[in-house]
């Protein structure tokens, strides 16, 4: 079974209640129910956190086939001192748009990640680095058109390391991201 992981960042737990003039009245639960109904043969996993480190951990967990959690330690087949930076560079060089099977024994093929990093879009170099290491496509989603928002929101640190970006289509952007991943 194909799996798509949707990761939302800070304040998106308040979707449907927060700044409804910008973000709309649909909750993320409603969005997920609609998406699951549209694509019953796909397993969706939804994660949300207001904490930057959680988003980084999840992108690494889902997006990097062999994980980078132990990359700071030398491991077999790697030279002494081979660390996270080397592993990340290797992952970036070997980056592929093909689905990755999780080594954990999970039978689901990860097709990609849909990422709405919220405010971390504009500030998190660490999240950008995690996305750059992803071996599955990451689609950046923004409910509003950040290019038409306040000056500080117009810069995305993620766009150039994501496979695709969708912005300004409301919560339909999540469905569009799923469709983009399915089309491959």
Can you describe what each PLM-predicted range is?
Residues 1-4:
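Extreme N-terminal starter segment of soluble prokaryotic enzymes
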């Amino acid at each position: 079974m194909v799996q798509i992981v949707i990761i939302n960042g800070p304040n998106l737990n308040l979707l449907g209640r927060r700044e409804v003039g910008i973000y709309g009245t649909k909750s993320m639960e409603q969005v997920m129910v609609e998406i699951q109904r549209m694509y019953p043969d796909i397993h969706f996993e939804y994660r949300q956190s207001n904490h930057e480190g959680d988003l980084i951990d999840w992108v690494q967990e889902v997006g990097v086939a062999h994980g980078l959690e132990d990359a700071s330690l030398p491991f077999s087949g790697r030279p002494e001192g081979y660390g996270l930076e080397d592993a990340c560079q290797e992952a970036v060089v070997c980056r592929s748009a093909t689905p990755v099977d999780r080594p954990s024994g999970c039978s689901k093929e990860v097709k990609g990640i849909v990422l709405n990093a919220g405010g971390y879009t504009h500030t998190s170099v660490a999240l950008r680095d995690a996305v750059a290491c992803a071996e599955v496509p990451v689609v950046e989603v923004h409910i509003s058109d950040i290019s038409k928002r306040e000056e500080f929101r117009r810069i995305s640190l993620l766009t150039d390391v994501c496979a695709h970006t969708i912005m300004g289509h409301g919560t339909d952007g999540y469905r569009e991201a799923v469709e983009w991943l399915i089309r491959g």
